[in-house]
Design a protein with these regions (language model features):
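Flexible glycine-/small-residue-rich
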Residues: 13, 25, 36-39, 82, ...
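Flexible, gly/ser-rich surface segments that form the specificity/activation loops bordering the active-site cleft
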Residues: 25, 45-46, 57-111, 120-123, ...
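C-terminal cap/linker of serine protease catalytic domains
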Residues: 6-8, 20-21, 39-47, 53-55, ...
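Short, acidic, Ser/Thr-enriched surface-loop or helix-capping motifs
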Residues: 13, 95, 130
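Short, solvent-exposed secondary-structure boundary/capping segments
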Residues: 30-37, 108-116
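Flexible, glycine-rich surface segments
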Residues: 119, 125-129, 152, 156-159
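Catalytic-histidine neighborhood of serine endopeptidases
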Residues: 1-40
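Terminal peptide-recognition signature
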Residues: 21, 35, 75, 80, ...
Length: 208
């Protein structure tokens, strides 16, 4: 994690509204990092408002009462939020839907799950929601499709992975940030889920 700690990292609600963040902890094996906002002096009013709502900024995002206690189930519907490709297409948050297609990750990794929700480069670290608005996982770095294609002779389609909420919580707890489980139980529309995601997801930029 020392390499990440030497990089400048900023967060915000888009590429033009960024504030500096300190990298407190990293977990390379799970593609997780814990950030702390270091200054909001130059932030826009919208960014300050978003940071105020979050209270705690974690990359991937997790905070008090957001993570679901039960791990995802096979066939469960999910919604993924993030800022794929940064600001190349637009500065706005993007959401995609899908379902849990396997309850294990690459190489039978029990700490991850597979989903068919569309995930593009730059989506890593984005929250994955269940139908009630609870976070059930965090998008892990995208599958190296070229490498897989060379191994099996074809490009994998709709194969993406998430880190289970239980692993995210374990990382936060070991970093000295205990969290409470989320208990949302009312099913929401995708529009409602997107609204929640917009208020809980930030763009993270690592500057070389």
């Amino acid at each position: 994690g020392e390499g990440y700690k030497r990089q400048e990292v900023t967060v915000g609600d888009n590429a033009q509204k960024q504030v500096t963040a300190d990298v407190l902890e990293t977990d390379r094996s799970n593609d997780l990092a814990l950030l702390r906002i270091s200054s909001t002096k130059m932030a826009s009013a919208d960014t300050k408002s978003l940071i105020s709502k979050l209270g705690i900024t974690v990359v991937p995002l997790a905070s008090d009462g957001l993570l679901r206690s039960e791990d995802v189930e096979l066939g469960e519907s999910v919604l993924v939020a993030g800022y794929p490709y940064g600001d190349i297409f637009s500065n706005t948050i993007k959401v995609t839907g899908g379902m849990v297609s396997a309850n294990r990750g690459m190489g039978d990794d029990t700490g991850q799950f597979q989903m068919d929700a569309a995930v593009q480069a730059g989506s890593s670290g984005g929250p994955i929601y269940d139908e009630n608005g609870n976070i059930v996982g965090v998008v892990v770095a995208q599958l190296n499709k070229l490498k897989v294609a060379k191994a099996i002779g074809s490009f994998p389609e709709n194969v993406n992975f998430g880190i289970k909420a239980s692993n995210v919580r374990q990382f936060l707890t070991s970093s000295g940030l205990p969290t409470k489980w989320s208990k949302r139980s009312k099913r929401m529309s995708t529009k409602q889920l997107a609204k929640i995601a917009k208020n809980q997801t930030v763009m993270v930029v690592c500057h070389p």
